[in-house]
């Protein structure tokens, strides 16, 4: 299938290549020149979080994240330049996104698209270009339906059987059942157990703000190793290879979601300097996240 041809070379390296290309297309669609688009693509693809999820085997999540910018590129190109060609790119990319089979990431992507479309609607009303907006939206809606249709063999069984899983609720629940299961599916605490805590937000800018990974290797020059040796702890060399350095709210983690100080600085600078409705769309969805 076309989807399988998206990955060039051995995996997971091919996932990163797809991430670079995808974000490069998004920046081009937004009118950024080629050189800056290359730099932006590298910054997005080399984000520390991408390597963490690859390390722990979240391949479908990585692919879904890699395809997000390509989907957005289609939407942006449709509303900014050529509606039909943008919708075609959007349709193909969204079909691939759904095929990646990570509904959580696709749901977040849908929130971003919705925010962007609302921003375009506000702009269309302000600039009195509502007919063009409606035309483009029809193309995008049709592409969405076709993209979902190409994955109906995956979506339909998931929807049908989700009612019998721990995430879809069950009629077999005991009257006084406790824990994570509720009659309507999983409770909020369980569903958000691996979500970033508010106090962890500085990790985006400051690496290891809430510590590192739940199992990190420390140096023999560290104070921890020195104390272990002084205390006569046996096999201290082995102990420091699996030290818990994370103190955030999650049960455990492979490391912080560090986005890069320069990237975060440029993001904030863009929110201050740039004009237009797209800026407020990005700011709003970032606060919601």
Question: Which role fits each region the language model picked out?
Answer:
Residues 1-2, 43, 287-289:
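Conserved oxyanion/phosphate-binding beta-strand-loop segments in alpha/beta enzyme cores
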Residues 1-12:
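Juxtamembrane segments of multi-pass membrane glycosylation machinery
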Residues 10-31, 36, 253-284:
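Selective detector of the "anchor" transmembrane alpha-helix that sits immediately C-terminal
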Residues 14-30, 35-123, 136-158:
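Membrane-embedded helix bundles of polyisoprenyl
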Residues 50-63, 243-258, 289:
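Membrane-helix boundary/interfacial segments in multi-pass membrane proteins
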Residues 125-138, 221, 225-241, 266-289:
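Membrane-interface helix-loop-helix junctions at transmembrane boundaries of multi-pass membrane enzymes
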Residues 131-159, 175-182, 283-289:
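Hydrophobic alpha-helical membrane-interfacial segments at the cytosolic entry of transmembrane helices
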Residues 153-270:
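Periplasmic/ER-lumenal interhelical loops and adjacent helix-loop junctions
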């Amino acid at each position: 299938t076309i989807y399988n041809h998206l990955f060039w070379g051995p995996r997971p390296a091919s996932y990163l290549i797809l991430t670079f290309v995808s974000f490069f297309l998004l920046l081009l669609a937004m009118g950024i020149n080629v050189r800056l688009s290359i730099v932006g693509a590298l910054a997005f693809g080399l984000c520390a979080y991408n390597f963490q999820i690859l390390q722990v085997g979240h391949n479908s999540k990585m692919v879904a994240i890699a395809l997000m910018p390509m989907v957005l590129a289609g939407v942006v190109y449709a509303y900014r330049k050529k509606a039909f060609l943008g919708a075609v790119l959007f349709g193909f990319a969204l079909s691939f996104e759904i095929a990646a089979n990570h509904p959580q990431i696709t749901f977040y992507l849908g929130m971003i698209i919705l925010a962007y479309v609302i921003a375009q609607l506000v702009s269309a009303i302000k600039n009195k270009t509502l007919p063009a907006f409606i035309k483009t939206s029809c193309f995008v809606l049709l592409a969405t339906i076709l993209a979902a249709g190409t994955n109906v063999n995956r979506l339909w069984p998931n929807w049908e059987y989700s009612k019998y899983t721990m995430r879809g609720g069950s009629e077999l629940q005991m009257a006084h059942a406790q824990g994570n299961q509720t009659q309507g599916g999983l409770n909020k605490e369980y569903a958000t157990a691996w979500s970033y805590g508010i106090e962890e937000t500085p990790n985006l800018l400051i690496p290891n703000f809430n510590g590192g990974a739940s199992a990190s290797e420390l140096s023999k020059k560290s104070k921890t190793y020195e104390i272990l040796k002084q205390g006569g702890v046996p096999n201290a060399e082995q102990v420091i290879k699996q030290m818990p350095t994370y103190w955030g709210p999650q049960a455990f983690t492979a490391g912080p979601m560090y986005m890069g100080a320069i990237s975060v600085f440029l993001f904030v600078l863009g929110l201050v300097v740039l004009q237009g409705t797209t800026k407020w769309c990005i700011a709003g969805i970032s606060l919601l996240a």
